[in-house]
Amino acid sequence: MSTAASPAPAAPIRVAAGTTAGAAVRDAGLPGRGAPDAIVVVREADGRLRDLSWTPDADVEVVPVPADSEDGRSVIRHSAAHVLAQAVQDLFPEAKLGIGPPITDGFYYDFDVPRAFTPEDLEALEKKMRKIVKDGQLFERRVYESEEEARRELANEPYKLELVDDKSGDPEVMEVGGDELTAYDNLNPRTRERVWGDLCRGPHIPTTKYIPAFKLTRSSAAYWRGDQTNASLQRIYGTAWESQEALDRHLELIEEAQRRDHRKLGVELDLFSFPDELGSGLPVFHPKGGIVRKELEDYSRAKHLQAGYEFVNTPHITKEQLYVTSGHLEWYADGMFPAMHIDAEYDADGAVRKPGQNYYLKPMNCPMHHLIYRSRGRSYRELPLRLFEFGSVYRYEKSGVVHGLTRVRGMTQDDAHIYATREQMRDELTSLLQFVLDLLSDYGLDEYYLELSTKDPDKYVGSDEIWDEATETLREVAEASGLDLVPDPGGAAFYGPKISVQVKDALGRNWQMSTIQLDFNMPERFELEYTAADGSRQRPVLIHRALFGSIERFFGVLTEHYAGAFPAWLAPVQVVGIPVADAHIPYLEDVAAQLRSRGVRVEIDGSDDRMAKKIVNHTNQRVPFMLLAGDKDVAAGAVSFRFGDRTQINGVPRDEAVEAIVGWIVERRNTAPTADLVKAGAGT
């Protein structure tokens, strides 16, 4: 989830045949090493990035790529990964190299070493890296004449040897790709002798001095190529930026992100947990978390009813044939839990008397919704038919990628499937996108852009013509929204292209949230039909959509967005009464009863803690409204407000206090209440 902005694209420059891209950059007077916007590579018209040492055979127009752009940072981080690998092999000569790609906001490199890296190791490696950067080693591209030459050179690097034969197109495998097998050598800038090298397709910065700021952040175990049947390696993570200022901002952001980590807040606020007895990626929600979750669902349910959705419910398991028909077993089996073979009957000798059947936990709700549609004849007058379900699904995620609530194995989706005529398709998509954006805004998420995921040429069903029509329709609807639209080539599910809403949180991080998929294929596979106005039988168009993605993921994102301080309408405890002394508890109980009668969630703190301690405790629990009462308040029939920002309003008549609280909640304000805001709302 990248948070840094990219500059506007630079104007193109011309590189003359037989000269380097770097020379053209210098001749154009563009920024060089040391500037945050230093040009680090250039981009050809087809999007390919080239080193500044690249020499074209013919005159060519290229776009300079600065260090403070997304691509520029990616190149710097990839080069920093090489510097890390060199440092590791200098300090740990027995280390074997895995892969080392740039990733969002950083990079990593995997190593096969005898033991795990320690914090002291990372300090030593960082020191070694600083020396390599200071030396200004040159990055030089070298083309292997043959695979045999590469294998001879890499004979002592078993993981690199495996990559020589790699044809997967994995974007994290920076070692190979394109039509050439290449290495990047690090050269002594004075003697040009080779100091170190790595199998790599590039591109890279000109010298190590183009890495102005970096830091190693942590290490962990990681399976080779993410496959738990492979060797367990040690992965070192780091980050690199175009300036020390940018790095410092990023590290501050990391610190704040750690403070907001929903896994940490889930424990501190008693919202949810992940019991070992249940297994990885299977959360349980505690009573307070259950309240937040219910509020999320109830509001969504009400909005869907207003929008004309019809609620359905489907089971958690199904016979195998359903996912044969849908294509999931052919295209999505790796994401499904293993089959359960049940209903077999055996005789006394153990021989099968009646064969059983395979059942699966459902990874998606859509096939079951299609059965509901198909359960009787449908008329064009019924369309669009919008079926909605809070449906539980189960997906096999590798243990290494399971992460809190945002990547789980058991989840509940706010899943809808809309069956429409082709003539209704565009208007339905347009209104659906607006419905999604409005509902996200109601939860306080109102900064977003759109991403258009198109077909994976190796993993799709249906004709190219159908895919082209679906993709173009989604593109037109997305562009008409006025939001930024970013391409995601090959990112679609096997049955149709999709628009995803990428939401920006309070820290500026982007999260994939809602998805809208247009599908012409499933109606064919399930033989879905409706009777048209002319009496003919027609196929409906299918729209898949999930607004939250999953309830669990949305819960996790909101927890971090609000740092656990949920808006009052979502908060598990909306008001807490804090007496100055025990004698004031009955009075606060009366106020609490008044609030409860209006649907407000209230607690009274009658513990033995001192009042100051109680205020600290409930501030830490992110309770939006704290009501204090002492002798003067009781005598005046009033209460005093205390807020999380330490502001306070004293002596508010209790009826006014109740109305202020109820009004704040009913209006679903997503800002935290403060003394000034409550006074303004009450007109005082």
From Swiss-Prot:
Its cofactor is Zn(2+). It is an enzyme of class 6 (ligase). Pfam families: HGTP_anticodon, tRNA-synt_2b, tRNA_SAD. Homodimer. It is found in: Cytoplasm. NCBIfam families: thrS. Zn(2+) binds at residues 366, 417, 544. PROSITE patterns: AA_TRNA_LIGASE_II, TGS. It comes from the Bacteria. Residues 1-66 form the TGS domain. This is Threonine--tRNA ligase. Binds 1 zinc ion per subunit. Belongs to the class-II aminoacyl-tRNA synthetase family.
